[in-house]
Amino acid sequence: MENTIVQLSKYVITFLMICFTVQSFAALKERDEDERHYILMRQIIMIILMNFICFFVMFLQEGEVSTIQMFLLTMAYILGVQILYRLIYRKASMILVNNMCMLLSISMIILTRLSVSKAMSQYKILAASTLLCFIIPVIVRKGKFLKNLTWIYAVLGIAMLSVVMVLGFTSGGAKLSIEIHGITFQLSEIAKITLVFFMAGMLREDNSFGNVVKATVIAAVHVLILVASTDLGTAFVFFMAYVVVIYVATRKARYPLLGLAGMSAACVVAYFLFSHVRNRVALWQDPIGNWDISSQLAQGLFGMCSGGWFGTGLFEGRPDIIPVATKDFIFCAICEEMGIIFGICLILLCMSTFLLIINISMKMSKRFYKLIAMGLGTEYATQVFLTIGGTIKFIPMTGITLPLVSYGGSSMFSTVLMLSIIQGLYILREDEGEELEKRRNKKKRNQQKNDPGAKKKRRPDEETERRKKSGRRDDGQGNPQNLAVRIEEQTENSLHW
């Protein structure tokens, strides 16, 4: 009977994940508020059902009370976040909240399967991070001073990376973190956010060659410190954020092209300088033949293959024998017991989150906030690419964790902080939209008051259609609308591409 339930559950879980992923993209495209609300409600139901089924199956298999405790704690977190965001931040992006809750649910499920103690530790860090970051949207929304701290961001980021380089301990061939009173801190996770804020502040008003050089020098210092610490995966994340922000700010292709050329040369140099880089390239080329160097990549690939399209079912596989299954290779553990289809949906869900962040960036009228959203979105997408790409042998392994899914306190805190900043930008954009609409309505009322017969010249629906087709607005004098209004109208359909 238990085996039947386990085998049926994996198909139900896959179906729920497919439906949630499809609904996630549908919510991005949907413009009707009522229909979007129904989509979000359906997603919440799917999250609850998936958690219930997975934890119920694990309880049947093991009979541990700790499994029930983790289920109740996970449900308390998800429902608490949903309620608090709706009460405190009514303008927040609930699509982003739902995506975050689903990714965190997957994390809690697979970590409970692999190690209940690590799942509990992760939950404590998650709860504390969420509470600490709940004020971040208010700071982003009201904190006009943030754009004036440009050089403070630079000094803070360089200082944190330097401390790790000097005092950090080596793990996996790289200096990644420091330990204070038994607590490990990976300061590069915070530095990647301060770097984006620095570059946005530097290029928010002046994207001249001089400012580009300043931004390049500071970004290069960040990257070189990481290279000296042999943390090359994080260095690549920093570099990609730099390239994208520079291009968005200047719209000059030569800057990212020169950067990519420099990074390519640096990769060649790193290959000959660092032995662990050569080992990872050798594992990437032949994971079976280099089993004596490390078996983690081969074990991960075997695990995914043994799971097949729908997985073996929870507690029916052996993801526990995969080295660092809770961190770098958590995607392999997920695919082994939940299936490759589930893993593909997980990738698409991460892609949906990235598209949402980029869309928020596109709709920001102020360059400072636009560059922040673009930089943070790039870092998120790069981390997902490096983690999953390394575990499926698409690229050499980098040691980067999967955001919101892998075990790790610093990574969890920085990702929650990042998404809280994005929420603040989304709320700020909603405020700008409301203010813009008020100005439009006020101007329209003034025009009608000054010219009572004006509203009879053209019906409202015809006027709206004319504006959509022309992309211009007649202000009574035949002049085009100002830049902010034009950007607003042109980005209304930005998701329909």
Model-derived regions: residue spans:
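Membrane-interface alpha-helices at helix entry/exit sites of multi-pass transporters
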Residues: R36-I39, N211, T326-A333, K370, ...
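Hydrophobic transmembrane alpha-helical segments in integral membrane proteins
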Residues: M1-M17
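Transmembrane alpha-helices of multi-pass inner-membrane enzymes
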Residues: K393-E435
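Hydrophobic alpha-helical transmembrane segments of multi-pass inner membrane proteins, especially
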Residues: G63-I293, C332, E336-G390, L417, ...
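TM-adjacent membrane-interface loops and short helices in multi-pass inner/ER membrane proteins
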Residues: P287-K327, F331, I340-F342
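Membrane-interface helix-loop junction between the first two transmembrane segments
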Residues: V22-I39
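Short, highly charged, low-complexity non-transmembrane loops/tails of multi-pass membrane proteins
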Residues: E432-R472
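Alpha-helical transmembrane segments
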Residues: C19-F25, V81-I83
